[in-house]
């Protein structure tokens, strides 16, 4: 949001309810760059527009949303109002009328204005604002109350997932509205609400809500963000009228009154009885197998809550037994968020146990994310999640055991790399490409990995690659193509420019990482190693681009191959990698195109453009160079506040 005003504001919530007749002003924003004179045609059209919005018939207010226009270009005015779904038509009309009467006082000479009230929103502009996403000039408001009985880092995790789920629900609904009740513990609950103007496309609504939800810090009880096209809010009381919106998800049904009470009692009692019987059956089975781990490969249900993967849960004592109490000799390695141990279950099945560090950057949100994401994935080039353990401060993931460690263990060791000839490496490149394609396109979800690197590619007995470490993965909604984040996580050197610098990521971000990975596989060199040896060379991407430009790409080839490779095949892979690391994300190919390029030599390849993070020599420099490389096997996480476009 290029003009987002972000500050802390103490809420005056004590006397506000969803059914209040008194309109409560929140905020407004005027466009000071476009103004009109009091006697102009635009002024006349604006007054006509506002009058029409405040004098509609009763049925028009019952819908809660109306648009209107007045005049002809260049003095045409477009306007709309949006009332909350849970308010009555009379409250809606009262709010719109009140807002109309205040517009010329708050924005007397401005051609554009947006006015936020507790019960409604009013907008007008000299541009077409109907069915057009606008996230400029918003307001972030937050209470000063700390979460009660909940740690702040846990509080964000508890709130963020339900709010994101509500955003997806709202985007897909006709009214573009959704609410959630979030249970913190037995005595505390939060209530969430998200909404968009109903004229928005599903994807525009979801993008708007994601921007707003991600701007909220979630470190206080109570917060909201107001944007022209959408809004979101959470607080520890029901600030909306529950009876007018239905029972929010995760809350218990409330009995009704009058003639419908019998129907409601039946509707409540019968499901509860069935649920009780199911629970009895489940607990009976679990009691019988209390000391036995579930060692079968589970199938997770659809949904983004960790509870849907309940059958994946392991007992901590059983994991301790499998790893000999995490004996150091069983330690396989250490990743960005904790240590990985080899374990053997009581059935004899070997597993890899990822024990997250208590001080690691991966909190419960990332932990839950990795469980939910990986549990849904079934592909030969993705590591299988067998289960998890969440007890006290322990957060543990149990994966299939992949015996040959990670790709970087072979690539960057002068002795071990001899085990990877070009034929094996070419198969590894193809396997990684197919795994990413599955994540992006062929699975039930659209998943952006965000941390593809050699250390996260595991190799099985036959040296087949398996993509691992989904803690930073993001699930995209239907038709979503890109997203923004304030928290840039991953490994510099593998990050695309738009992600590292602006927090913008998409499938093309993974494509960039794949390109870097291919260059490392071909050369046997780390992307960052060249900079450590010679700052003028920069990184592997820069070095490759210079070789390509000079017509000598074969100099990149790992000398350990000898003459055992096809020049045309390896040159084509370098060409594909350079297409993947182009600076502009739109220029990079999709993973489906990449797989076709790798398998069919008849497909003509476009000429690559200069890559992102290109280190220019003194002769090449047209400006300062950018150094974003770091050691490729260490996660360097950072926090970045971005300004979404």
UniProtKB/Swiss-Prot annotation:
Biological process terms from the Gene Ontology for this record are: defense response to bacterium; response to salicylic acid
- What name does UniProt use for this protein? Cysteine-rich receptor-like protein kinase 19
Chain segments annotated as transmembrane: 263-283
Question: Where, per the database record, does this protein carry Phosphothreonine?
Answer: 491
The chain positions of domain Protein kinase read 326-603
Span of domain Gnk2-homologous? 24-129, 135-239
Q: Quote the catalytic residue positions.
A: 451 (proton acceptor)
Instruction: List all Polar residues biased stretches.
Output: 620-632
**Region of interest called Disordered, as start-end residue ranges on this chain:** 616-645
Q: Name one GO molecular function term.
A: protein serine/threonine kinase activity
This entry's Enzyme Commission designation comes to 2.7.11.-
| Source organism of this protein record | Arabidopsis thaliana (Mouse-ear cress)
Positions glycosylated per UniProt:
29, 39, 57, 101, 185, 241, 260
């Amino acid at each position: 949001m290029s003009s987002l005003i972000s500050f802390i504001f103490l809420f005056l919530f004590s006397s506000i309810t969803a059914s209040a007749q008194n309109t409560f002003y929140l905020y407004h924003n005027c466009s000071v760059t476009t103004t009109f004179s009091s006697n102009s045609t635009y002024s006349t059209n604006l007054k006509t527009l506002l009058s029409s919005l405040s004098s509609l018939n009763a049925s028009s207010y019952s819908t809660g949303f109306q648009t209107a226009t007045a005049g002809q270009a260049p003095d045409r005015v477009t306007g709309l109002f949006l009332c909350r779904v849970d308010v009555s038509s009379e409250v809606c009309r009262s709010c719109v009328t009140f807002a109309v009467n205040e517009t010329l006082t708050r924005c007397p000479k401005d051609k554009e204005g947006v006015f936020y009230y507790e019960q409604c929103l009013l907008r007008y502009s000299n541009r077409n604002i109907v069915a057009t996403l606008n996230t400029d000039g918003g307001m972030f408001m937050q209470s000063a109350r700390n979460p009660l009985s909940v740690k702040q880092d846990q509080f964000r995790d508890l709130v963020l997932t339900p709010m994101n789920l509500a955003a997806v629900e709202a985007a897909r609904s006709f009214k573009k509205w959704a609410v959630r009740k979030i249970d913190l513990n037995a005595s505390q609950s939060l209530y969430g609400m998200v909404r968009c103007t109903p004229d928005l496309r599903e994807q525009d609504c979801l993008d708007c809500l994601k921007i707003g939800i991600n701007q909220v810090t979630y470190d206080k009880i109570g917060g909201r963000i107001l944007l022209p096209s959408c809004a979101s809010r959470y607080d520890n009381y029901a600030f909306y009228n529950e009876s007018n919106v239905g029972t929010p998800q995760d809350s218990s049904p409330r009995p009704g009154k009058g003639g419908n009470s019998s129907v409601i009692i039946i509707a409540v009692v019968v499901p509860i009885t069935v649920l009780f019987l199911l629970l009895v059956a489940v607990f009976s089975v679990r009691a019988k197998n209390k000391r036995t781990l579930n060692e079968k490969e589970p199938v997770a249900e659809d949904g983004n809550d960790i509870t849907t993967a309940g059958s994946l849960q392991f007992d901590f004592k059983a994991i301790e037994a499998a790893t000999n109490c995490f004996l150091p000799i069983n330690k396989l390695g250490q990743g960005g968020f904790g240590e990985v141990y080899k374990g053997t279950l009581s059935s004899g099945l070997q597993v890899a146990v990822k024990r997250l560090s208590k001080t690691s950057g991966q909190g419960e949100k990332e932990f839950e994310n990795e469980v939910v994401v990986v549990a849904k994935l079934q592909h030969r080039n993705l590591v299988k999640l067998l289960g998890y353990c969440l007890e006290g401060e322990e957060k543990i993931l149990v994966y299939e055991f992949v015996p040959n460690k990670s790709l970087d263990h072979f690539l960057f060791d002068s002795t071990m790399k001899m085990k990877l000839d070009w034929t094996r490496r070419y198969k590894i490149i193809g396997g990684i490409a197919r795994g990413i394609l599955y994540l992006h396109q062929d699975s039930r979800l659209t998943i952006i990995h965000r941390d593809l690197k050699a250390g996260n590619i595991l190799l099985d007995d036959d040296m087949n690659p398996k993509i691992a470490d989904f803690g930073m993965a993001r699930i995209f909604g239907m038709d979503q193509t890109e997203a923004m984040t304030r928290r840039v996580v991953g490994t510099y050197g593998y990050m695309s420019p738009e992600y590292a610098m602006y927090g913008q990521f998409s499938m093309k971000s993974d494509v960039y990482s794949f390109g870097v990975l291919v260059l490392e596989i071909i050369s046997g060199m780390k992307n960052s190693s060249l900079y450590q040896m010679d700052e003028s060379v920069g990184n592997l991407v820069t070095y490759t681009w210079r070789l390509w430009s000079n017509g000598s790409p074969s100099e990149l080839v790992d000398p350990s191959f000898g003459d055992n490779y096809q020049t045309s095949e390896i040159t084509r892979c370098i060409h594909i990698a350079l297409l993947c690391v182009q600076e502009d994300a739109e220029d990079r190919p999709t993973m489906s195109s990449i797989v076709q390029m790798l398998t069919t030599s008849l497909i003509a390849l476009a000429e690559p453009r200069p890559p992102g993070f290109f280190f220019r020599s003194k002769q090449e420099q047209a400006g300062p160079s950018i150094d974003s490389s770091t050691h490729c096997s260490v996660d360097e996480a950072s926090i970045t506040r971005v300004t979404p476009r």
